[in-house]
Amino acid sequence: MAKIWSWVQVDSIRSLCVVSFHQRAVMAASSTLQEDQVKQKQRIEASKLYINVSPDEKDPVVYSSSYNVSFLGIEKLHPFDASKWSHVQNFLSDDGVLKQKRIVEPVEATRDDLLVVHTEKYLDSLNSSYVVAQITEVAPVAFLPNFLVQWKLLHPFRKQVGGTVLSAKLAKERGWAINIGGGFHHCCANEGGGFCAYADITLAIQFAYTRLAISRVIIIDLDAHQGNGHERDFTNDDRVYIIDMYNEDIYPQDFKARKRINQAVALKSGTKTDRYLALLSQELKKAATIFKPELVVYNAGTDVLEGDPLGRLLVSPEGVKQRDEMVFRFAKDQKSPIIMLTSGGYMKTSARVIADSIKNLAAKRLISLPSGSSGSSS
């Protein structure tokens, strides 16, 4: 019988088939990615989170009484002060820094809004009270009806997400904005944790890309914990520059996410105020020579305070005020709008420190609060 095919010919045909299959797979993946990007853009453009706010009527400070978590006392089983946000607002009002009627009320993020970043599978998983209990680290939540978990826990979180997204728009218009909430920096597109159920930082930046024509963002994450959520989300996005100063001895110890940090400052438990501020000053000066931001996202966790049970650092209240002032001066020097998120902070004293810091920013003319602030310029 005649030899029709040589082994060389067979191998050549096999190679062509493999290449062809690979090309089809790449083309299919590319097509899916393009479709996802189109859907993302459509969702952002259709969103109602970017409400119009008159500067004559409101200051760029975002807050809602819906931010606070309170149901059956279960929230007290987590060290986080679940009413911290209302305490900050009350202190600012009582101190004459901010009139309640001039605070901006955000819109709650809808499922379509959240799908800009999150997967369907992840959002569906939040219909399980057990999953939410794992994310919030409050075990009894697992035994509650999910409608109650949605109402009393996830609704406040979604409201804060709306506040973070809106803050970017306000900052673009006014130069700065503060969300008295948000900063859920442990959550990424497909996973929550550390009391963070939604990736508000990632969402705010994605909205800023599309709606604000912003293409260079710096995240300055000064919460005591590593911001592994946004680090994972922006793994392949060099439009975002990340500075993260965190206690490397504590949660989450996400070594894979650490590779995404542009300027990582791994602190040790017990780091004191002077050392902390010196390191921050050094990193801000370095960043100023490397990256020119069009938006600064400042995650201003107060779990760095001495006595915080989870942060384990030894920064004084005055040190937090100086820290916040340094970051706002950095943004001012860079001529970049800035948003501040209150993020973590697990002591009852955190709210007072945050309010005092905002009051200091107003006194130093780093923010303008004509509704009630006063103080000498520096």
Can you say where each PLM-predicted feature lies in the sequence?
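Short, functionally important structural connectors and interaction interfaces within domains
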Residues: L72, D95, P106-A109, H118, ...
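Short, flexible active-site-adjacent loop segments at beta-strand->alpha-helix junctions, enriched
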Residues: S65-Y67, E120, G183-F184, Y246
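Alpha-helical structural motif
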Residues: K84, T110, H118-Y122, Q160, ...
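A general "terminal functional-core" signal
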Residues: A2-K41, K48-Y50, P55-E57, A133-S378
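Charged, often glycine-rich, active-site loop that binds/positions anionic groups
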Residues: V107-V131
